[in-house]
């Protein structure tokens, strides 16, 4: 069947974070926009099942839900293609941001996929400003997907904006090299630490595990 050939998995980096936190017993909520279509309804049902609040979720009758097609090569490496012209997620406006949800949160998490186009770019910046004004910790995962950007300068601008705003940074080794130009991860972490006011830096290394920086200490953990 088509589903066997193309299995459907609700997801997206921020929702994956929310799902893990919800499973650990934390209260979570999602802010964003999806189409009032089969994919959008599936995403809402999944959030409800995961006990993730959908008070900040907007259903659009005008725009479709964005879909990502993931291809795995023989080494298990992923590549992405997107059906997103124009996706409902891009059309979230400043007025649709659930301000109370942000004000009542301890951590606000975001990535660059909500900064590729307007109006969601301005909506994201407004949400970050609300978090800052209310002393909410800001967590940032660049989650760089080249297919969604017109050029490298635009994504570097978005990543640097996130680096200037976040308290917690989760970044991949490839993204860290992309933004610093350094392939030595220790040096790249120190470069980021010295340039930005970030409290905790987490670097994923794929199958090789992860690194972290916290209170002037750099550590390493092997993969599971």
Name the predicted role of every residue range.
Residues 16-27, 72:
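Alpha-helix C-terminal capping segments
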Residues 100-101, 161-162, 194:
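Structural alpha-helical scaffold elements that stabilize or flank donor/cofactor-binding regions
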Residues 135-142:
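Short beta-strand/loop segments at the ligand-binding rim of alpha/beta enzyme cores
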